[in-house]
Amino acid sequence: MQKIRRDDEIIVIAGKDKGKRGKVLKVLANNRLVIGGLNLVKRHTKPNPMSGVQGGIVEKEAPLDASNVAIFNGETNKADRVGFKVEDGKKIRVFKSTQKAVDA
């Protein structure tokens, strides 16, 4: 079970976007995350009339390492760590500070 999943609200704790919040769009296999609207990079694309792609400079989200982000706890309005707890035979994610379920 992963500590950070898709659609979790996170806060960046290190790097050029430190302090910014966003939602996880994609979790990659090599412990990296794509977050909406953060870590934007410019990519030069060639026009491709076959697929209708217009050329130019395109801004897109680049992956961030999972160690540079923390899950955002809406109850405390701070970054928090995630732990696990077994409840009714199911393993659930909980915030370390409040011991409340992340997915609640």
From Swiss-Prot:
Record function comment: One of two assembly initiator proteins, it binds directly to the 5'-end of the 23S rRNA, where it nucleates assembly of the 50S subunit.
Self-association state and partner proteins as the record states: Part of the 50S ribosomal subunit.
Family: Belongs to the universal ribosomal protein uL24 family.
Positions in coiled-coil regions: none
Domain of life per record: Bacteria
Organism, scientific name: Pseudomonas fluorescens (strain SBW25)
Keyword terms: Ribonucleoprotein, Ribosomal protein, RNA-binding, rRNA-binding
Any one GO MF annotation of this record: structural constituent of ribosome
GO CC terms: ribonucleoprotein complex; ribosome
Single biological process term from Gene Ontology: translation
Keyword RNA-binding listed: yes
Protein name as catalogued: Large ribosomal subunit protein uL24
Claim: RNA-binding is one of the keywords in the record: yes
